[in-house]
Amino acid sequence: MQRLVAWDPACLPLPPPPPAFKSMEVANFYYEADCLAAAYGGKAAPAAPPAARPGPRPPAGELGSIGDHERAIDFSPYLEPLGAPQAPAPATATDTFEAAPPAPAPAPASSGQHHDFLSDLFSDDYGGKNCKKPAEYGYVSLGRLGAAKGALHPGCFAPLHPPPPPPPPPAELKAEPGFEPADCKRKEEAGAPGGGAGMAAGFPYALRAYLGYQAVPSGSSGSLSTSSSSSPPGTPSPADAKAPPTACYAGAAPAPSQVKSKAKKTVDKHSDEYKIRRERNNIAVRKSRDKAKMRNLETQHKVLELTAENERLQKKVEQLSRELSTLRNLFKQLPEPLLASSGHC
């Protein structure tokens, strides 16, 4: 709008009219000084400054059918078919944005040259139909933004990229209770004063390095076995992490092979105890075999009994079927009057 006013000096508004003419002013109608003379009590309206006095008016054919004392602004020659240009945003003197250089105001031109001038201006500003002009403001770097953070006020814009959120707290690490008993530490300190301290100092580090890849939530049963842990490649294996406590447990608990060897007792086959045990086992085996034979005999006897009963029932069914057939034949041979009298009875 400022550019249009600068191009056409006749568009400058006159001093504010009295309240009677405010309704006409809303409709963008402007009145000349001689029209407002009556409103100021017969006195001429205050004249505009020499720099803002209107030039020669264009003929009435260009502005359309309007009154003698009225002038309307026809924006049709100023508008491009593609759309009106957007006014650049006002630059603020803050530390957040860099003020863009103000565009030079164009010199006034005649009404016949407005269309060519605007088309050239739009082509320079927007770079053609399919090109968009970049924004006329820049953003401050991170260092400058941090230095000027205290000078920001609520009206300033916030940076595009918000600060990254704080990292989540590490998950709770849960280890097996009694993984490193106190007696093991005592044996290490008593056995090797120099080397035991180094192993005791290195073992917690290995345990922590291994536990870093096995974080379990509180309340779940966490274990350090290879089946439940999923460690990425390049991490210490569970066997390496458990090597020091295995050596420590060797004195406290025997190995599985030792347990098996202790479970097997050396028995002399020529002793009386061995003979008595063998006799008891033989007697138990004979009893179990005799019981199995008795069960087989009882089963066979029961099968024979059921087979005989089945044959007897089949014979009885055959006999009853024969009797039924004879009775049917008898009823068929009886005369009908006898059957009718027997039915009334």
Swiss-Prot record:
<dbReference type="GO" id="GO:0034976">
    <property type="term" value="P:response to endoplasmic reticulum stress"/>
</dbReference>
<dbReference type="GO" id="GO:0019900">
    <property type="term" value="F:kinase binding"/>
</dbReference>
<dbReference type="GO" id="GO:0006355">
    <property type="term" value="P:regulation of DNA-templated transcription"/>
</dbReference>
<feature type="region of interest" description="Disordered">
    <location>
        <begin position="218"/>
        <end position="271"/>
    </location>
</feature>
<dbReference type="GO" id="GO:0033598">
    <property type="term" value="P:mammary gland epithelial cell proliferation"/>
</dbReference>
<dbReference type="GO" id="GO:0045595">
    <property type="term" value="P:regulation of cell differentiation"/>
</dbReference>
<feature type="modified residue" description="Phosphothreonine; by GSK3-beta">
    <location>
        <position position="226"/>
    </location>
</feature>
<comment type="similarity">
    <text>Belongs to the bZIP family. C/EBP subfamily.</text>
</comment>
<feature type="modified residue" description="Phosphothreonine; by RPS6KA1 and PKC/PRKCA">
    <location>
        <position position="266"/>
    </location>
</feature>
<dbReference type="GO" id="GO:1990647">
    <property type="term" value="C:C/EBP complex"/>
</dbReference>
<feature type="region of interest" description="Disordered">
    <location>
        <begin position="79"/>
        <end position="116"/>
    </location>
</feature>
<dbReference type="GO" id="GO:0031490">
    <property type="term" value="F:chromatin DNA binding"/>
</dbReference>
<feature type="modified residue" description="Asymmetric dimethylarginine; by CARM1">
    <location>
        <position position="3"/>
    </location>
</feature>
<dbReference type="GO" id="GO:0044389">
    <property type="term" value="F:ubiquitin-like protein ligase binding"/>
</dbReference>
<feature type="modified residue" description="N6-acetyllysine; by KAT2A and KAT2B; alternate">
    <location>
        <position position="133"/>
    </location>
</feature>
<dbReference type="GO" id="GO:0120162">
    <property type="term" value="P:positive regulation of cold-induced thermogenesis"/>
</dbReference>
<dbReference type="GO" id="GO:0006954">
    <property type="term" value="P:inflammatory response"/>
</dbReference>
<dbReference type="GO" id="GO:0097421">
    <property type="term" value="P:liver regeneration"/>
</dbReference>
<dbReference type="GO" id="GO:0035259">
    <property type="term" value="F:nuclear glucocorticoid receptor binding"/>
</dbReference>
<dbReference type="GO" id="GO:0043524">
    <property type="term" value="P:negative regulation of neuron apoptotic process"/>
</dbReference>
<keyword id="KW-0963">Cytoplasm</keyword>
<dbReference type="GO" id="GO:0001541">
    <property type="term" value="P:ovarian follicle development"/>
</dbReference>
<dbReference type="GO" id="GO:0060644">
    <property type="term" value="P:mammary gland epithelial cell differentiation"/>
</dbReference>
<dbReference type="GO" id="GO:0000976">
    <property type="term" value="F:transcription cis-regulatory region binding"/>
</dbReference>
<dbReference type="GO" id="GO:0070169">
    <property type="term" value="P:positive regulation of biomineral tissue development"/>
</dbReference>
<dbReference type="GO" id="GO:0002432">
    <property type="term" value="P:granuloma formation"/>
</dbReference>
<dbReference type="GO" id="GO:0030182">
    <property type="term" value="P:neuron differentiation"/>
</dbReference>
<feature type="cross-link" description="Glycyl lysine isopeptide (Lys-Gly) (interchain with G-Cter in SUMO); alternate">
    <location>
        <position position="174"/>
    </location>
</feature>
<keyword id="KW-0805">Transcription regulation</keyword>
<dbReference type="GO" id="GO:0001228">
    <property type="term" value="F:DNA-binding transcription activator activity, RNA polymerase II-specific"/>
</dbReference>
<dbReference type="GO" id="GO:0000981">
    <property type="term" value="F:DNA-binding transcription factor activity, RNA polymerase II-specific"/>
</dbReference>
<keyword id="KW-0221">Differentiation</keyword>
<dbReference type="GO" id="GO:0071347">
    <property type="term" value="P:cellular response to interleukin-1"/>
</dbReference>
<dbReference type="GO" id="GO:0032675">
    <property type="term" value="P:regulation of interleukin-6 production"/>
</dbReference>
<feature type="region of interest" description="Disordered">
    <location>
        <begin position="157"/>
        <end position="178"/>
    </location>
</feature>
<dbReference type="GO" id="GO:0000978">
    <property type="term" value="F:RNA polymerase II cis-regulatory region sequence-specific DNA binding"/>
</dbReference>
<dbReference type="GO" id="GO:0001227">
    <property type="term" value="F:DNA-binding transcription repressor activity, RNA polymerase II-specific"/>
</dbReference>
<feature type="compositionally biased region" description="Pro residues">
    <location>
        <begin position="47"/>
        <end position="59"/>
    </location>
</feature>
<feature type="cross-link" description="Glycyl lysine isopeptide (Lys-Gly) (interchain with G-Cter in SUMO2); alternate">
    <location>
        <position position="133"/>
    </location>
</feature>
<dbReference type="InterPro" id="IPR046347">
    <property type="entry name" value="bZIP_sf"/>
</dbReference>
<feature type="region of interest" description="Disordered">
    <location>
        <begin position="46"/>
        <end position="67"/>
    </location>
</feature>
<dbReference type="GO" id="GO:0042803">
    <property type="term" value="F:protein homodimerization activity"/>
</dbReference>
